[in-house]
Swiss-Prot record:
<dbReference type="GO" id="GO:0005634">
    <property type="term" value="C:nucleus"/>
</dbReference>
<dbReference type="GO" id="GO:0005829">
    <property type="term" value="C:cytosol"/>
</dbReference>
<feature type="site" description="mRNA cap binding">
    <location>
        <position position="291"/>
    </location>
</feature>
<keyword id="KW-0507">mRNA processing</keyword>
<keyword id="KW-0506">mRNA capping</keyword>
<feature type="binding site">
    <location>
        <position position="324"/>
    </location>
    <ligand>
        <name>S-adenosyl-L-methionine</name>
    </ligand>
</feature>
<feature type="binding site">
    <location>
        <position position="354"/>
    </location>
    <ligand>
        <name>S-adenosyl-L-methionine</name>
    </ligand>
</feature>
<keyword id="KW-0949">S-adenosyl-L-methionine</keyword>
<keyword id="KW-0694">RNA-binding</keyword>
<feature type="binding site">
    <location>
        <position position="233"/>
    </location>
    <ligand>
        <name>S-adenosyl-L-methionine</name>
    </ligand>
</feature>
<keyword id="KW-0489">Methyltransferase</keyword>
<comment type="function">
    <text>Responsible for methylating the 5'-cap structure of mRNAs.</text>
</comment>
<feature type="compositionally biased region" description="Basic and acidic residues">
    <location>
        <begin position="129"/>
        <end position="150"/>
    </location>
</feature>
<feature type="site" description="mRNA cap binding">
    <location>
        <position position="266"/>
    </location>
</feature>
<dbReference type="InterPro" id="IPR029063">
    <property type="entry name" value="SAM-dependent_MTases_sf"/>
</dbReference>
<feature type="region of interest" description="Disordered">
    <location>
        <begin position="18"/>
        <end position="165"/>
    </location>
</feature>
<comment type="similarity">
    <text>Belongs to the class I-like SAM-binding methyltransferase superfamily. mRNA cap 0 methyltransferase family.</text>
</comment>
Length: 531
């Protein structure tokens, strides 16, 4: 039994040894194959992991041959321009610069681009170059077609909501656009023939207000004429707009058809206490308010002395309203937004209407409404001061038949700066009967683009002012006003304004075609009667 047992044990050991030997060979073969595969993989990955791995993101590397540009140099699809804060770029772990070439369309001179996500996309950057800004902004010559015509007001006009104005976007840099080539203003008013005068005028001046913010005023082709007209207004207002003597009450100035607030500086010159501006153009009123707000007076420390007011800023109070003063009363326009203003600030010392009264002469009712507004707003002795086209000038052009050729066969006069085109055949004697509704289209280069206006027969204006208790004090054309008043005002007006009226002969005033264009206007002053 012992012999059998020993034989069985030897047999079992032999079987185990053979099995162990077979397992060792298989293990060796397996180890050899795995080592070979690992070697191949390492050799492949040494050239490029991207060739065998699809789920690994592309990483810029100085040693890899990249077939696709990294995400941070790609030009993405444009996004909303207010989406300035893109996600942070992934930080590359590679050492050394990438050999990846930028696309030809990509700018290579922006040294900050590698730190900004989607650096090539202009609209995602907080601070953008002038060239990129200009590429995005509409050409001023195309502005009317691109945006203004997209917004319609209640009358079918193209009034722009405040939310679309540049003045409501404090990050908008107007100086950028103003550095470009100057483009003269041209309005874009659709269906003009079907609109009433209010809609046309409102739309025109809305567009004009937006356009002017994109231009440098001194580059205007009529800058000398603008300066001349401003000097005339300084002279008229300076001579006749006065504080009431012997009465302790604020010096108040009512600016009807105030536009963009172009006479705010003149009110500071007059040292008024309270300004009220009303205009039919909502965009112009918004611009006037912003102009006032930006220059509202601040007080400077004098280190122990009495505080001094900044002479370059406005130290009067002001309020602004949008409305048609030719069809509504002043209380109707002001009281809804400024309750109690009539009782607190009226009557006023001066009412001013500059280059606008002629629009009222469409109808007798409009003229009576505006003159009633003026008279009821003024204190006794207060002044009504304005500028209008001269009916005498128009009559002379008609009588002498001093007309220009017109493609439509209509009667037209003027020069390269301005033109007057009559809607109907004018009377041969130049006297319009009846005195209302005598329309012509007026154009002034870079200012008024073929807008309907109405002849203002001055004797009719005088008679209607007398009907509401106002007496004529002055009627004079611009050239005569300037020649008479410039010696007095030469030292009072700013050097910039004076130098802006310098003629080719070294003297000051208007010359050539500008002289005829400014000669189209007169200034007037009426005084409110009573005690």
């Amino acid at each position: 039994m012992s012999s059998n047992t020993d034989a069985e044990i030897q047999l079992l050991q032999s079987i185990k040894e053979k099995a162990a030997a077979a397992g060792t060979q298989n293990s060796a073969a397996s180890t050899s194959g795995s080592s070979s595969d690992s070697k191949i993989t390492r050799e492949s990955s040494a050239f490029s992991r991207r060739e065998i791995t699809n789920d690994v993101p592309i990483v810029s590397s100085a040693y890899s041959e990249v077939k696709e540009a990294p995400a941070w140099v790609k030009k993405d699809t444009p996004v909303d321009k207010y989406d300035k804060y893109g996600s942070r770029p992934a930080v590359s772990t590679s050492s050394g610069p990438s050999r990846v070439s930028r696309p030809e369309s990509e700018s290579t001179d922006n040294k900050y681009s590698k730190y900004i996500s989607r650096a090539a996309e202009p609209s995602t950057r907080v601070k953008r170059s002038r060239e990129e800004f200009e590429r995005e902004e509409p050409d001023p010559r195309e502005y009317g077609n691109s945006r203004i015509e997209q917004e319609k007001d209640d009358d079918g006009g193209a009034a722009i909501p405040y939310s679309n104005l540049d003045v409501s976007n404090q990050s908008y840099d107007h100086r950028t656009l103003q550095s470009r080539e100057y483009y003269t203003f041209q309005s874009h008013i659709s269906n003009k023939e079907e609109r009433d005068i209010n809609s046309i005028v409102r739309t025109h001046y809305n567009q004009r207000a937006v356009h002017s913010k994109r231009q440098v005023r001194k580059n205007s082709p009529i800058i000398k004429m603008r300066n001349f007209n401003n000097a005339i207004k300084y002279m008229l207002l300076g001579n006749y707009s006065k504080r009431e003597q012997g009465v302790d009450r604020p010096f108040t100035f009512l600016d009807l058809c105030c536009g963009k607030g172009g006479d705010l500086n003149k009110c500071q010159f007059l040292e008024i206490d309270q300004y009220i501006g009303i205009d039919i153009s909502d965009v112009s009123v918004k611009e006037a308010f912003q102009r006032y707000s930006q220059k509202k007076v601040r007080f400077r420390s004098a280190y122990g002395q009495k505080p001094r007011k900044d002479e370059l800023r406005y130290d009067f109070e002001a309020c602004f309203a949008t409305g048609d003063c030719f069809s509504k009363t002043i209380p109707e326009l002001l009281e809804p937004n400024f309750p109690g203003i009539i009782d607190k600030t009226f009557p006023v010392d001066t009412v001013s209407i500059q280059f606008s009264l002629h629009y009222a002469f469409e109808t007798e009712d409009k003229v009576r409404t505006i003159l009633t507004n003026v008279s009821r707003s003024l204190r006794p002795g207060g002044k009504f001061i304005g500028t209008i086209p001269s009916s005498d000038f128009i009559r002379k052009k008609i009588v002498t038949k001093n007309y220009l050729p017109d493609d439509r066969g209509k009667k037209k006069f003027g020069n390269s700066l301005y033109s007057v085109t009559f809607d109907k055949e004018p009377p041969e004697d130049g006297v319009f009967r009846p005195p209302f509704g005598n329309k012509y289209n007026y154009s002034l280069k870079d200012a008024i683009d073929d807008v309907p206006e109405y002849v203002v027969p001055f004797e009719t204006l005088r008679a209607m002012c007398e009907d509401v208790g106002m007496e004529l004090k002055l009627k004079k054309n611009f050239i005569d006003i300037f020649n008479q008043e410039i010696p007095k005002y030469f030292s009072k007006l700013s050097k910039h304004l004076i130098e802006g009226m310098k003629r080719s002969d070294g003297k000051y005033g208007a010359e050539g075609e500008e002289k005829e264009a400014v000669g189209f206007y007169i200034g007037f002053v009426f005084e409110k009667l009573g005690s």
